Amino acid sequence: MVKSRKISILLAVAMLVSIMIPTTAFAGPTKAPTKDGTSYKDLFLELYGKIKDPKNGYFSPDEGIPYHSIETLIVEAPDYGHVTTSEAFSYYVWLEAMYGNLTGNWSGVETAWKVMEDWIIPDSTEQPGMSSYNPNSPATYADEYEDPSYYPSELKFDTVRVGSDPVHNDLVSAYGPNMYLMHWLMDVDNWYGFGTGTRATFINTFQRGEQESTWETIPHPSIEEFKYGGPNGFLDLFTKDRSYAKQWRYTNAPDAEGRAIQAVYWANKWAKEQGKGSAVASVVSKAAKMGDFLRNDMFDKYFMKIGAQDKTPATGYDSAHYLMAWYTAWGGGIGASWAWKIGCSHAHFGYQNPFQGWVSATQSDFAPKSSNGKRDWTTSYKRQLEFYQWLQSAEGGIAGGATNSWNGRYEKYPAGTSTFYGMAYVPHPVYADPGSNQWFGFQAWSMQRVMEYYLETGDSSVKNLIKKWVDWVMSEIKLYDDGTFAIPSDLEWSGQPDTWTGTYTGNPNLHVRVTSYGTDLGVAGSLANALATYAAATERWEGKLDTKARDMAAELVNRAWYNFYCSEGKGVVTEEARADYKRFFEQEVYVPAGWSGTMPNGDKIQPGIKFIDIRTKYRQDPYYDIVYQAYLRGEAPVLNYHRFWHEVDLAVAMGVLATYFPDMTYKVPGTPSTKLYGDVNDDGKVNSTDAVALKRYVLRSGISINTDNADLNEDGRVNSTDLGILKRYILKEIDTLPYKN
């Protein structure tokens, strides 16, 4: 009762604030006060502290779950800011891994994984009946359709036979029947009300084809007990069944599991280097288990034969595409002994993680317990690397992906369609509103993983792939004299790749064009991470540091931090004009004729409703009046956002710079350079005194110097090589600094 009253008071205050602030929103960006010469380690620790500060609101106060954003009114993949995703949980693990690396305190990694395990991974009570799952009859077939108006889709019990699931028994033998994967979406504050009180609860949204944008979804519970919706809950909005039963169902997004395992790999490596491997050993074991279960994402949706171009049931591994698909899903009855499982026929390059695949295939600490796990991951990570090469455009960007089920109905591919191991090229897998590969962020996210793979393996087969991508992306980054920046935002694709035969052809008929630029802070952080990791890899494996990539990474971090520093001390913040927010009031959400139901708060679900009509609680949000008044004026509302993944991606990039280039420091962007190479003691001169100071620094005598001025060959390090260069300069054997040979 007290908690409910407190929430009501807070909502009343929030509504009052929304009335008082008519234009843009709170906690906007200002210039960072950080001084030149601040180490990237200190920069990371500052941002880490802001993310973890309970007063800043990145985590739920009761469970410690990371929200999608501090702000509640936001619509993108999640349709509410205090909904969260498996993505956010994986970023939490990554944040704590980097913190352990830089401080030696590894407790956060265990905490982050525990929060993940406690909340976003369904436990045995939340997936009852999996022991009744029959891998020889994994699911009942239903067609996919392009548009929500074609749904519900009929379940075809008798007319379509599906293939068999070849991985399930292997996993059961090692771990038991329950899946160890994350469901992708959770209502942390129980805003929709499908759960109990304010307890976090599983929900879902997307169900109805490639044209179903977030604006056209109908949120529904993952555990369907017929409490809300219509007589059959929400089930008959999506599938046409003979009868409907209470049930549960979950869907993963494998890039999140991949990122979590990737982060634990680094935690394990760094902790062992510190002599503290035991501090993360239990988490490593769980990450290895998760990697084994992630093999479920390697298979066609209904286990049909790859490349058949019809509904041909597969046996064994004939249904394995070995890529990371968009999802795997599983479900079953409540109080009944039945369960089902599906894979996914569509693969997007942005979800691939060959680095994680390599970890699961080759690293003993992450070895799968199953009989076939190591073999499958060995095939998978190599197949994923081929996938990137097949999809690399003539310019260098990576195109969308492939499908084994044309139009979601296993139709014949159009004549002339390029293929990859029998799968058809699609520029925008899974979603078309907007196109799933329009967003530049997938380029940075996915290629960062390839950079880590190269860094750890030195595999020369990917050298040309990543060099071409780096050259392309570097040419598209804009650094302005005033210290601001712009990176690609939207991409336009044309043509298609050549059919894959095992060798990259250059894809002269596949092209990408950047159509807009922006300052997405998370993408900027991920891009900086990718470039810095690439630079470190060139030094390790090619004998020559790519200083341009390293310096661009630093520029992106510096400029993102400096220009978007939150005025209220909450990290970094974006200021965004959201023209799409008119869809709050204009976007119709398709409901079949004759169907009616209710949301938990009483909102009516019926034909003709708009997005806001089944989310009327948004009218109580502090941002709502800003959005509504802007809509009435025909303007795009300008709002400030603190996204959890944005903060973490930028923080991790800071940590990467601190790890691989410890002598580099933050520089206020847009200020004239005052660097005097060789002036190690900052007295405005270069002479033998500087040589003495640099020698003491190299010998670790505890002396403080200007490391920017001391890096005389610009390799990101200050060592005896720089001392030798300085001595030669003082003796006039070298005319200018910096000196590169």
UniProtKB/Swiss-Prot annotation:
Catalytic activity as recorded in UniProt: Hydrolysis of (1->4)-beta-D-glucosidic linkages in cellulose and similar substrates, releasing cellobiose from the reducing ends of the chains
Residues given in the record as Ca(2+) 1 binding sites: D679, N681, D683, G684, K685, D690
Subcellular location: Secreted
Protein name per the record: Cellulose 1,4-beta-cellobiosidase (reducing end) CelS
Range of residues in the leader sequence: 1-27
Activity regulation, free text: Inhibited by cellobiose and lactose, but not by glucose.
Chain sites annotated for binding Ca(2+) 2: D711, L712, R717, D722
One GO CC term, this protein: extracellular region
Known function: This enzyme catalyzes the exohydrolysis of 1,4-beta-glucosidic linkages in cellulose with a preference for amorphous or crystalline cellulose over carboxymethyl cellulose.
EC annotation from Swiss-Prot or TrEMBL: 3.2.1.176
Source organism of this protein record: Acetivibrio thermocellus
